[in-house]
Regions:
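Generic detector of N-terminal low-structure segments
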Residues: 4, 20-23
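Short S/T/G/P-rich N-terminal loop/turn motif that feeds into the first structured element of a domain
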Residues: 25-235
Length: 235
């Protein structure tokens, strides 16, 4: 489901060279959007004692700048409930030729670095868009990370991610599926939208019914998982 600078600066960008897995476990090509094949996801942690509104204003402008550099579409979410009190900035792009053109234009912008860093920590991920069923950015977003056992092959991890994605996609009506391409961790990500907490409650019941009836005895080999509820600031 997303420039930079606080007292404790901890910019983490550990690049893991890992080939982009562009097929599903059954061997068929994944149905990612032709135009939005990749998503740059950047998280910006809210520093202790900071007014989040200041960082929000800075990042909202950053995302407008990112679009002016050539990204297909950019937006911004804010932490609502979950583990990391942060902003989530996303930008979609088609391929790495476009990404290079964006870098050149961004580097030529002298104003880009003339800002004060207002966040405490930052990460970047480049994710491959495997399934794209969300047609617009939801106002309220469920963002999930799924890591599977290291003893599994890439195809086996994909098979488990597809099972979970199918369950959430049916429960929420429309979701997206992403896979690690470059960044700090090898994981799959699923995001789904909901209107409000009454709607979320209905979808909560729906996913738990599927989990109980279809996946309760499934061997999913989940190593790590996180849920975050986010609210849209700008699309």
């Amino acid at each position: 489901m997303f420039k930079k600078k606080g007292d404790i600066m901890r910019i983490i960008l550990t690049i893991l060279a890992f080939f982009a897995f562009n097929v599903n476990a059954d061997g068929h090509a994944s149905d990612e959007s032709k135009d939005n094949a990749y998503m740059l996801l950047s998280t910006y942690e809210i520093a202790p004692g900071q007014n989040p509104a200041d960082l929000e204003k800075e990042l909202a402008q950053l995302q407008l700048d990112q679009e002016s550099y050539g990204f297909n579409d950019c937006g911004l979410y804010r932490h609502w409930y979950g583990g990391q009190r942060a902003f989530y900035a996303y930008c979609f792009f088609t391929d790495f030729d476009q990404f290079e053109a964006i870098r050149i234009k961004s580097d030529a912008d002298d104003d880009r670095m003339a800002i004060t860093q207002n966040y405490s920590g930052h990460t970047d991920h480049i994710l491959h868009v495997q399934k794209a069923n969300l047609k617009e950015a939801p106002t309220n977003l469920l963002w999930m990370k799924w890591e599977f056992g290291p003893y599994l092959t890439v195809a086996e991890k994909q098979e488990r991610a597809d099972k979970l994605f199918d369950a959430f996609n049916r429960s929420f009506g429309a979701c997206n599926l992403y896979f690690h391409s470059w960044g700090p961790e090898i994981a799959h990500y699923i995001d789904c939208g909901f209107e409000n907490f009454s709607d979320f409650g209905k979808k909560h019941d729906a996913i738990n019914k599927i989990l109980a009836e279809e996946l309760a005895t499934a061997k999913l080999d989940i190593l790590d998982h996180s849920d975050d509820l986010l609210i849209l600031i700008q699309d």
